[in-house]
């Protein structure tokens, strides 16, 4: 290879290398965002914010703030960092039985662009001068911007509830507020006076925001409602019915069986004895009618009638076996005696 061609090839190699290096440098340059977490404090103040480089594929910086207000105060949670999704802004207001919440979410696609929301000023209007309202007699534990350690059991301060803005605050609340943004989740407890006395694990949600909890009735009843269930008095209670008495069941069963059982035997067995008992009964009645005549006339016929009474028992008595061969001579003798008696009378 001549020197001119060799120099040209080297120049092309160097040019391609520089272009490749520039491309790799441009692709490796990550998005930079501010990062901080604020939990009812100054965690996102300018002197506490940090700058972070986002992972490859992350195209937006995000910042979110959620403010909660009770009738005794307000606090806010905030998160800044690398986000996901599309650039834009989303605001929403929520109300949970008199607890107010406001959420702001903003995302942008430039370096260090997520410091536009003013987190030092409150996002909600002041709760007002509570001394201007007379207490209504209910007291509740209050957790407004307190840490979870400071809001345990009966440790929080006790506040007197009052009615404001034409609303009655006679219930106590125990719950949590949670804010999730930039792959970070922060949460704080919330306690205070609310308008509902019987809510059970109610909640409201917004973009990456949740406010939930339970209500109770009575002063200082909100020391711990996490594992308790309450039922509204407006719902009919469950009533346990007494078991039925055994005597009632037994009598009902006996009546049913005693009524139905005799019907079948009588309907099936009653025709059976009819042919066997009908013929002897007719024979007895016929012989009785024949014996009645001599008994009225007296004499030997009466003795004959008494002698035949042993062979044919009375109606309803036990049937005795007898000799059928002697029936004809006895009947002939009775007829002869009857003829003799009639001749004597004439």
Swiss-Prot record:
Q: How does it sit in the membrane?
A: Lipid-anchor; GPI-anchor
What GO MF terms are annotated? laminin binding
- Those residues forming the propeptide, per the database entry, are 327-346
Name the residues where the record annotates lipidation as GPI-anchor amidated cysteine: 326
Q: Where is the composition biased (Basic and acidic residues)?
A: 283-295
Bias-annotated ranges (Pro residues): 234-246
Xref: PANTHER family: LY6_PLAUR DOMAIN-CONTAINING PROTEIN 3, UROKINASE PLASMINOGEN ACTIVATOR SURFACE RECEPTOR-RELATED
Question: Can you name this protein?
Answer: Ly6/PLAUR domain-containing protein 3
Source organism (scientific name): Homo sapiens
Q: Which gene encodes it?
A: LYPD3
């Amino acid at each position: 290879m001549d020197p001119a061609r060799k120099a040209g090839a080297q120049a092309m190699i160097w040019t391609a290398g520089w272009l490749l290096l520039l491309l790799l440098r441009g692709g490796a340059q990550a998005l930079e965002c501010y990062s901080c977490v604020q939990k009812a404090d100054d965690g996102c103040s300018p002197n506490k914010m940090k700058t972070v480089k986002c992972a490859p594929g992350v195209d937006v910086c995000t910042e979110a703030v959620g403010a909660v207000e009770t009738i005794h105060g307000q606090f806010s949670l905030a998160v800044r960092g690398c986000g996901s999704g599309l650039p834009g802004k989303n605001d929403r207001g929520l109300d949970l039985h008199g607890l107010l919440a406001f959420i702001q979410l903003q995302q942008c696609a430039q370096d260090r662009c997520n410091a536009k929301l003013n987190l030092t000023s409150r996002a909600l209007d002041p709760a007002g001068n509570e001394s201007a309202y007379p207490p209504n007699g209910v007291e509740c534990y209050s957790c407004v911007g307190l840490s979870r350690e400071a809001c345990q059991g009966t440790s929080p301060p006790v506040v007197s509830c009052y009615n404001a803005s034409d609303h009655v605050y006679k219930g106590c609340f125990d719950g949590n507020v949670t804010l999730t943004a930039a792959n970070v989740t922060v949460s704080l407890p919330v306690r205070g006076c609310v308008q509902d006395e019987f809510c059970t694990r109610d909640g409201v949600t917004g973009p990456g925001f949740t406010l939930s909890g339970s209500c109770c009735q009575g002063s200082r009843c909100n020391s711990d409602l996490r594992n308790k269930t309450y039922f509204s008095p407006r719902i009919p209670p469950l009533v346990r019915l007494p078991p039925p008495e055994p005597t009632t069941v037994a009598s009902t069963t006996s009546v049913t069986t005693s009524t139905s059982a005799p019907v079948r035997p009588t309907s099936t067995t009653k025709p059976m004895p009819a042919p066997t008992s009908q013929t002897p009964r007719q024979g007895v009645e016929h012989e009785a009618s024949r014996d009645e005549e001599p008994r009225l006339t007296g004499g030997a016929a009466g003795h004959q009638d008494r002698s035949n009474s042993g062979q044919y028992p009375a109606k309803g008595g036990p049937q005795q076996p007898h000799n059928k061969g002697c029936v004809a001579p006895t009947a002939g003798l009775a007829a002869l005696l009857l003829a003799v008696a009639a001749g004597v009378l004439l």
